[in-house]
Curated annotation (Swiss-Prot):
Species: Thermococcus onnurineus (strain NA1)
Name of the protein: Flavin-dependent thymidylate synthase
DNA damage found in the keyword field: no
Coiled-coil zones: none
GO molecular function annotations of the record: flavin adenine dinucleotide binding; NADPH binding; thymidylate synthase (FAD) activity; thymidylate synthase activity
Stated family: Belongs to the thymidylate synthase ThyX family.
Gene: thyX
Residue positions binding dUMP: Q80, L81, V82, R83, Q91, Q92, S93, M94, R95, R149, R176
GO biological process, one term: dTTP biosynthetic process
Listed Gene3D superfamilies: 3.30.1360.170
Cofactor note text: Binds 4 FAD per tetramer. Each FAD binding site is formed by three monomers.
Amino acid sequence: MRDGIKVRLVNYTKKPLETVTWAALISYWDEWETEAFERLGEKDVEMHLPRILGYGHESILEHAVLTFAIEGCSRVCSHQLVRHRIASYTQQSMRYIKINPRDVEETFVIPESVKKNPELYEKWKKLMRETIQLYEETYKAGVHQEDARFILPQAVRTKIVVTMNLRELKHFLGLRACERAQWEIRDVAWKMLGEIAKNEELRPIIRWAKLGPRCVQLGYCPEGELMPPGCWKRTREKWKEVALG
């Protein structure tokens, strides 16, 4: 896992944009026309969805959900992720999955800021090797794995499946794709956006719902004096590259 965090879009609502559009149009119909869903085409979506979202009626986005598989992030990152409570999560269990005593960077996330200091970097790796060794000694001594895991640091890599509706995903990206977000969760956010951008069926919603950091959604940076120098330009350019290709 030396190549960093992997994010993959594994599933999503069938005909997601048609589903969202149909749900929106229900508000205006006198009759419950479920058959109308099958009649909705690309032109209908393009005619209605951008206009309805432009009015701020974003609750309709909740009718489409996306499921992502995230691999290789630390538990520091996953703890931030699960704070977004309008979502579903299933995480790799440290009670049943033993840590494999391989290269420490296959097992733990080490920040780049630490790697820039060679002496400190070696101390980190030494401590992590010792941690793995003691972890193994603990469960080999008969201590249950659910107790042996207590020694593991938050740097340990994990896997997690995340399911969010489009409205919550917009909220998540607004906060976590921001340059002020912690670097690891920010990486996850941009990779999630990249997965949507690669999907022809989903790609239009990026533009219509303004999926991305809050500066993209709002047209200005809401961080005020906390905005990092040059952030506005960097973020907009990155969004165009990732989201629009």
